[in-house]
Swiss-Prot record:
WD repeat placement: 202-240, 242-280, 354-395, 462-504, 510-552, 554-594
InterPro entries named in the record: 6-blade_b-propeller_TolB-like (IPR011042), EIF3B (IPR011400), Nucleotide-bd_a/b_plait_sf (IPR012677), TIF_beta_prop-like (IPR013979), WD40/YVTN_repeat-like_dom_sf (IPR015943)
Main location: cytoplasm
Organism name: Caenorhabditis elegans
Knockout or disruption consequences: Extended lifespan in adults.
The protein's name: Eukaryotic translation initiation factor 3 subunit B
């Protein structure tokens, strides 16, 4: 009997013919399944490369692996690790790790980078994605040749001047050519070039601007290919830093580091092609210490401000505002932190920024690693200003204030005090244009932190008029607040007394017009109140060392736009430079600290005037007492030197004029002899008329003419007849 499979008999054959090739891809057939397939990029995001682990042999590899696993499992118990073996069976000093997700891997990088495994081993952690971006070493790399030391001479030669004269540099046009010159300030005389004429003054010395280093050791110039530092008595080239199209430069406080910035030539909104626009160099060696991406630091392709990095006084730390984060709609939120870097490793301190919500600005103390910050207010959160101790990150003192529209901070040079100015509104309204209008008036306050007091005391000073400017006496206990408006600005001098809860008003000086800035002399005691970019151009010179501040002089420099004290506080300069008000006579004027004019120079297209800074010198208490004890003798010596110099200058002028007159007499005698020799010839040419004959005195006629210079009406005395009538 034969079995028949009826189903098979009726079923159609769907088999592919021999040699058939299917052209339908899996992406079309099962896209929902392939979407879940892991990619290499996702895997790399979860992997972290760690270098710096101990190099051990095969006998100790197992123990090392168990210790490393304990360290890593503190961050994530699900971590997987692999130690690449060496040919001998030991390890190579590197570790490969895989984490649960990208967030865990990023946290591991921040936590393990710089982690001290023991006293001899410190980890360096990088994600696999970052490792792929590293360029391979060049096949043609060779060991750099040892460079000879470039000796430019004594960098502080100018400090050895017997009269302690200050120097300054100016940038202006000379015969139509941009020129930079370094001059020595000669009290009572015109400034002299500080060196040979061909070395101390040069045409096209810089392509944009020049800058002194903080201690005055170097003069820096900007060029298309980079930065050049000049030093020594001959202003020789000391260092060169290659940075194409560099725009801005800045020094660290002790001249150890130089920061340069060049805007990226090509970049998109994601910051591509821009990885080293911000660079930090070692000034002494010329080594590039660190390069930053502007986009990674700020979230933008351009810097928001300059200088961008703020340095601590000892250069151990430098900081900038953290890049703003974005919400789900890619909108920028307010900045909520400070990125603090260590200059020893040029890495972010503890691998993460310091979180401070809505932070607007910050400044380092001039004498300690204390950081002052200001966080702006929102509708729900008040503004906060306070002090942060680094590296402990302890908040020494803070205060919160509602409805703050504007704020500024002012450190005292001694670092003992910090002043915060705040403008506080009652109510605000938003206009259709988006502008903010403050309704109900504003109040103005100055809050002062006393850093040297226990628990950092805080005092408040309400101001009766709008705030304009503020400045501290650098070493004393006084400060000046400029209040009012452009029509009437009043400088007020206050003093902080011991055990007082508020500053005491010492003097309220005469009000002036268009005053907009106050400047204490670097050594304190004297104060300058400036009316910059005004038609009057007044400057008040005020002595604040007395029990009551006293104005000593008022000077005028119409339309000046810059004013500077010299580093010693002996001289003050006012300048009218390019970029100021149109119509101003460009040039500078130098005054004594009391306001007596010493020098006036008009220059074509004056662009810059900068005093040469002096390095800080700390004298012992014994030396200070010795100087105070001999102050009268020293002052008498300087007065005699000034008098001798004036006499010497007068004698030099007289001698110079005598030489000029003698040379003129020689030329006149020679021309007179030539004139007498050709007199007969001239008479014959004039038909016998001697037009050069001297006139006889008898031919002159004396005539007197009386001219009334002025007239006035007076009542004539009455006669006897008029009196009788």
């Amino acid at each position: 009997m034969v079995e028949i499979d009826f189903n098979k008999e009726n079923e159609e054959d769907f088999s592919d013919p021999p040699g058939f090739v299917d052209d339908v891809t899996d992406d079309v057939l099962v896209p929902d399944v392939l979407h879940k397939k892991p990619t290499i990029d996702e895997f790399e995001d979860n992997c972290v490369f760690i270098a710096g682990i101990p190099v051990v042999g095969a006998d100790r590899l197992g123990k090392l692996q168990s210790v490393l696993k304990k360290v890593l499992e503190r961050l994530d118990p699900a971590v997987k690790l692999y130690i690449p073996p060496s040919p001998e069976g030991g390890c190579l000093g590197v570790l490969l790790t895989e984490w649960a997700d990208q967030r865990s891997a990023q946290f591991a990088v921040k936590s393990l980078n710089g982690y001290a495994f023991d006293k001899n081993h410190t980890f360096t952690a990088r994600s696999f994605k970052d490792m792929k971006q590293l360029e391979a070493p060049s096949d043609h790399w060779t060991t750099p040749e040892k460079q000879a030391y470039n000796d430019v001479g004594d960098l502080w030669w100018w400090l050895q001047n017997e009269r302690c004269r200050d120097q300054f540099a100016i940038s202006h046009d000379k015969l139509g050519v941009p020129t930079v010159g370094v001059f020595t300030n000669m009290k009572g005389n015109d400034p002299e070039l500080a060196g040979d004429a061909d070395k101390a003054e040069r045409a096209n010395w810089t392509e944009t601007v020049f800058t002194w280093s903080p201690h005055g050791s170097y003069l820096s110039t900007i060029h298309k290919q980079g930065i050049i530092l000049w030093g020594g008595k001959d202003y020789a080239r000391a260092h060169r830093f290659a940075h194409t199209n560099v725009q801005y430069i800045d020094f660290s406080p002790c001249e150890t580091y130089l920061v340069t910035y060049a805007a990226p030539e090509e970049s998109n909104s994601w910051g591509d092609c821009e990885k080293d626009s911000l660079r930090i160099w070692d000034v002494r060696t010329g080594e590039l210490k660190k390069a930053f991406s502007t986009f990674e630091l700020t979230g933008r392709t351009q810097l928001p401000t300059w200088p961008f990095f703020r340095w601590s006084f000892d250069e151990k730390y430098f900081a900038c505002l953290k890049a703003p984060e974005k919400d789900k709609l890619e909108r920028e939120q307010k900045i909520n932190g400070i990125s603090i870097f260590e200059s020893e490793k040029f890495e972010l301190y503890e691998g993460r920024p310091v979180n401070i919500e809505n932070i607007k600005q910050f400044e380092w103390s001039p004498t300690s690693t204390v950081l002052a910050y200001y966080s702006e207010c929102t509708d729900a959160v008040p503004a906060e200003f306070g002090l942060l101790q680094v590296p402990s990150m302890q908040r020494l003192r803070s205060a919160r204030v509602h409805n703050v529209a504007d704020a500024q901070m002012f450190w005292q040079k001694s670092g003992k005090r910090l002043a915060f100015y705040t403008m506080r509104f009652k109510k605000k309204e938003y206009r259709e244009t988006g502008e903010v209008k403050y309704v109900g008036g504003c109040q103005y306050h100055v809050d002062i932190f006393e850093i040297d007091k226990k628990d950092v005391s805080l005092m408040n000073l309400p101001l009766s008029e709008p705030f304009i400017h503020f400045d501290w006496d650098p070493e004393g206990d006084k400060f000046c607040v400029l209040v009012g408006n452009t029509a009437k600005a009043t400088p007020q001098v206050y003093k902080i007394e011991a055990n007082s809860h508020a500053p005491k008003l010492v003097s309220k000086l005469d009000a002036g017009v268009h005053f907009n800035e106050v400047q204490f002399a670097p050594k304190g005691g004297w104060l300058a109140v400036l009316a910059k970019v005004s038609a009057g151009g007044n400057v008040y010179f005020i002595d604040t060392s007395l029990s009551e501040a006293k104005r000593t002089n008022v000077i005028e420099h119409p339309l000046f736009n810059k004013g500077y004290w010299d580093p010693t506080g002996r001289y003050f300069v006012t300048c009218s430079t390019l970029g100021g008000r149109a119509g101003a006579d460009l040039g500078y004027r130098i005054f004594t600290f009391q306001g007596r004019e010493l020098c006036r120079k008009n220059l074509d297209r004056l662009a810059q005037f900068k005093w040469r800074p002096r390095p800080p010198v700390k004298l012992s208490e014994q030396k200070q007492r010795e100087i105070k004890k001999n102050l009268k003798k020293t002052a008498a010596k300087f007065i005699k030197q000034d008098d001798d110099e004036k006499c010497r200058a007068s004698q030099e002028v007289v001698e110079k004029r005598r030489k000029i007159m003698a040379a003129f007499d020689i030329i006149r005698s020679r021309n007179r002899e030539q004139l007498d020799a050709t007199r007969d010839e001239r008479i014959s040419l004039r038909n016998g008329v001697d037009t050069e004959a001297q006139l006889d005195e008898d031919e002159f006629v004396d005539e007197e003419i009386t001219i009334a210079l002025s007239t006035s009406k007076t009542q004539a005395p009455l006669t006897e007849e008029e009196m009788r009538d």
